[in-house]
Amino acid sequence: MSKNTIEISFLHRQLAMILTSWGLTSIVMGITLLFFDVDFLRSLSIQFLIWGIVNFLLGIFPLIRNSIPNRKRLYKILLINSFLDVIYLIVSFLLIFQIVFQGESAVGHGFGVMIQGLFLLVFDTYYGIRFKRIED
């Protein structure tokens, strides 16, 4: 294995472990917040549960497969995801400021999307840059 292949494999595993951990943390937070009888917190919990399940699954499958990804392909995926994360943040502001929907529930969903979207924006951008810098 070349030095670059080892670095790609290490970064990919690191990325998957962080995403899996974030997903599990979000699921636990989502379940915990479900016990509160407040619309804002219930809506926040739904967002944490949905995003948590998706992030957990996206993180666990690469760990199970344990394969070495194509660097360019992974970089492109992370770049596209970074742009999607910006869209998630725009949607979160529409919900928080009640531009589309009204009520405490909309604000809770907005903050849920904002928290998850901010994490993913930093995460996807950081790892996208890291994968881009590795030479073929």
Where in the sequence are the language-model features?
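Polytopic alpha-helical membrane-helix bundles and their juxtamembrane interface segments
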Residues: 2-136
